[in-house]
Amino acid sequence: MTSTAPDNSRNRADALPKSWDPSAVEAEMYERWVSAGYFTADPASGKPAYSIVLPPPNVTGTLHMGHALDHTLMDTLARRKRMQGYEVLWLPGMDHAGIATQTVVEKQLAVDGKTKEDFGRELFVEKVWDWKRESGGAIQWQMRALGDGVDWSRDRFTMDEGLSRAVQTMFKRLYDAGLIYRAERLVNWSPELRTAISDIEVKHEDVEGELVSLRYGSLNDDEPHVVVATTRVETMLGDTAVAVHPDDPRYRDLIGTTLEHPITGRQIPIVADDYVDPEFGSGAVKITPAHDPNDFEIGLRHNLPMPTIMDERGRIANTGTEFDGMDRFEARVKVRERLAREGRVVAEKRPYIHSVGHSERTGEPIEPRLSMQWWVKVEALAKAAGDAVRNGQVVIHPASQEPRWFEWVDNMHDWTISRQLWWGHRIPIWYGPDGEVVCLGPGETPPEGWVQDPDVLDTWFSSGLWPFSTMGWPDATPELTKFYPTSVLVTGYDILFFWVARMMMFGMYVAEDPALTAGKDPGQVQVPFKDIFLHGLIRDQHGKKMSKSRGNGIDPLDWIRSYGADALRFTLARGAQPGGDLSVGEPHALASRSFVTKLFNATKFALLNGAAPGELPDRGSLTDADRWILDRLDEVLAEVDAAFDAYEFGKACEALYHFAWDELCDWYLELAKVQFAADGARAESTRTVLGTVLDAVLRLLHPVIPFVTESLWKALTGGESVVVAAWPTASGVTPDADAARRIADAQRLITEIRRFRSDQGLADKQKVSAKLIGVDSAELDALAPAIAALARLTEAGPDFAATASVEVRLSGATVTVELDTSGSVDLEAERKRLEKDLAAAQKELATTEGKLGNEAFLAKAPEQVVDKIRTRRDVAAAEVARIGARLAELGAR
């Protein structure tokens, strides 16, 4: 339509590009935000505080879709709170990732045929720092591409001097309190890395192994013997007992006796233990306390010897047998072969599918191994972490995750914190020449000649201090006074028990520290965060977990390049719900990009027609359409606020999507076109209403899709930046229920006319002569011009002859629609089209009914699949009926 807008609005429209090209504007726009200081937090501000610490990604890594989800949700929260008038600190940083980083650098050295030992510890650590300085910036660049509104002036790294000081302080406090100790216990051992690794670094995979049943004791059936089965036959070199259930009658007479070890010759006892399942296998279990976690516990209960039979590289050692020096997998074969030669192998099953823990870093099977390590005594720490949630000091969203939290913290085992690495926080323990041991805090110097413990701390130890160490603890700082406790932690439920638990334990341990309580309400407990929001895992569009082996992973940077950061962010936020997994694929990204494009085109149309926010005219002078869209805006604002406050990102995005697309663009913009063509006052008020609603929609959408909304909002309002614009608030006006009812009736009438037109074979844009009977009874007189325009109807002339009619039942009356399609439709062509459509519908009906009548299919198919087929069947049946009726109608002509 021809624009009646004033010239300045056309200038504002010209400020926008012809079409939205994210790659042309996003990078420059982001740097403008950073340069303007919008993301820099001011601890001296009088505004209420809102703070989030970014879960630190590994310095070795790049952002995957899980990171992109985390960052999108955190940025959404931070941007919204900033618009609501809060002083926002979103603090970024990276984790030094001990094992991962050391492995990367060692692999680089290996290319030149070098090892870390060739350089020595000090020089190797310096090489790691060099690598970090050269390669550590990739993640920051990716965060900028995503649009993360973080305070770059406070960027932290877990090996920074300040954070290292915090780590040493916490270690000494725990050590002095008797909560850190050294002991020989079973750990997950990586022979390739030659270090203990944490549970979270172990992934369990099904492998094709072997199950070997072997005979202890006499080879004569009438003399004492037992049969045990194992998937790791080499570990029998470290067996120190055979366990049976105390009530198993088969072994009652053997309990307390000994049998000769088939290879070492030592006598090993038969012990009774309730752990053994008498129904499984032979009911007898070989016990290798130094190389199996369950066997270790049995060994403790029965005071068994615990010889370690493998060295740090996974080679057999100290057994006094011909197998010493062999790799564990070679020994597995050789031990089995010897036992077979001696007639002790009773049965072999291969392949035998069983689950084996693998190192996430190297891919090798981990080896449970008895090792001297440093441990944290967690009982009191874990109780405090659990109580913080029980007492409501920390709230988990969704609440359905609370039982998992309590199950974990209430049953936590002591935590091994030492790692046999060179890169990381060195354990601050020194040993004297006569066996003395001292723990030193920051700034303390060891006596001359004392040697520091060679191990480093588990990465989770330093990242467990992240919420407060990043703000300057153990010093009292303005940041801690203003922004601690942090407002919310956003993370996936899959690491709830690892990183989150560590932060909670440490945070509660120092909750009464003067550095954290200074300037605070004495009654306020200094928890690390007030809320924990747990989202689910990202799956592909078919609901399968993303993994390298499946090849179904998505690089978020690829999506940013293809669809723009806004489309990526909207896809992730729209699918996010508390505790629930979300499935994403290209169709979702395309839909989000279409939404961004729709918003861009709608704003450009509004600008071309002079739309601008301003003081709204008196309600009495507004049309039903105006009052309806303004009232709906209030309703959607309330829905969006409630959803965001409850961390229901998906619900907020759905509300905004449907309001912006279905109601604002598809309905109000079309109604506005009719109003723009009216007299000057009506057109002007329409411009103000459209501008006001669009202004609010852009502000509401900004936290999720910041780039396009910034460009559009500045063009629409001429404001500085939507980043610092005020969050919309409710108008306080009582909604007009009558206007809403009339608009709903008009929408139903237009929709039914469009459907009826289609049934008559009319093209979408083809106008047709029509009569609407009963419009006055339905109170739609004022909307009649809009109904005619949107339904593509023209006024009936003197030659009007109705060829088809339909009755549309509305809320208070029935409107009859008569159409004159004579000369508008090629009846023969329409008949052929309908016959083709009928054949397709009949085929779909037959296919779906066939599946639903197949008992074998119904027995195997998932319920959701069957439901989808039922829906398809119902749709096909309705289509067959509708098309058949239309063909019958054509046959009567």
Curated annotation (Swiss-Prot):
GO biological process, one term: valyl-tRNA aminoacylation
Protein localization: Cytoplasm
EC number: 6.1.1.9
Motif ('HIGH' region): 57-67
GO MF annotation list: aminoacyl-tRNA deacylase activity; ATP binding; valine-tRNA ligase activity
Catalysed reaction, written as an equation: tRNA(Val) + L-valine + ATP = L-valyl-tRNA(Val) + AMP + diphosphate
Enzyme class: ligase
CDD domains for this protein: Anticodon_Ia_Val, ValRS_core
Family, as annotated: Belongs to the class-I aminoacyl-tRNA synthetase family. ValS type 1 subfamily.
Record comment regarding domains: ValRS has two distinct active sites: one for aminoacylation and one for editing. The misactivated threonine is translocated from the active site to the editing site. The C-terminal coiled-coil domain is crucial for aminoacylation activity.
Functional description taken from the UniProt entry: Catalyzes the attachment of valine to tRNA(Val). As ValRS can inadvertently accommodate and process structurally similar amino acids such as threonine, to avoid such errors, it has a 'posttransfer' editing activity that hydrolyzes mischarged Thr-tRNA(Val) in a tRNA-dependent manner.
Protein name stated in the entry: Valine--tRNA ligase
Native source organism of the sequence: Nocardia farcinica (strain IFM 10152)
